[in-house]
């Protein structure tokens, strides 16, 4: 047998910020949902959480597409309530939407002060809308430069 490992096509290794994991036990970690309070999320076995080799502030989480994950909400007394169930695909879409919104907001914040691009006319000859007098004035100005 070779050392070939068959990739499970039903699992997505998805990278998230470590900030989404507020606490960890020996066996599992609580992962917050994006854009929700810090007390709403899901538990994931530590077997499915891997450190990122390239980015120290990220981890990869292994989400099974068609698995049902109970979304847990904790009240002020830390009593656990199952809020709803989401599939792995729905969780991935939720994190993708969060990332897309984040990058859109960052782009607006970083580049909002830059001048806007002006749309050019479709015709390449900018003199077409000028009057004959204006064209002659431009020609005379160019002659004066020589």
Curated annotation (Swiss-Prot):
Belongs to the plectrovirus ORF4 family. This is Uncharacterized protein ORF4. It comes from Spiroplasma virus SpV1-R8A2 B.
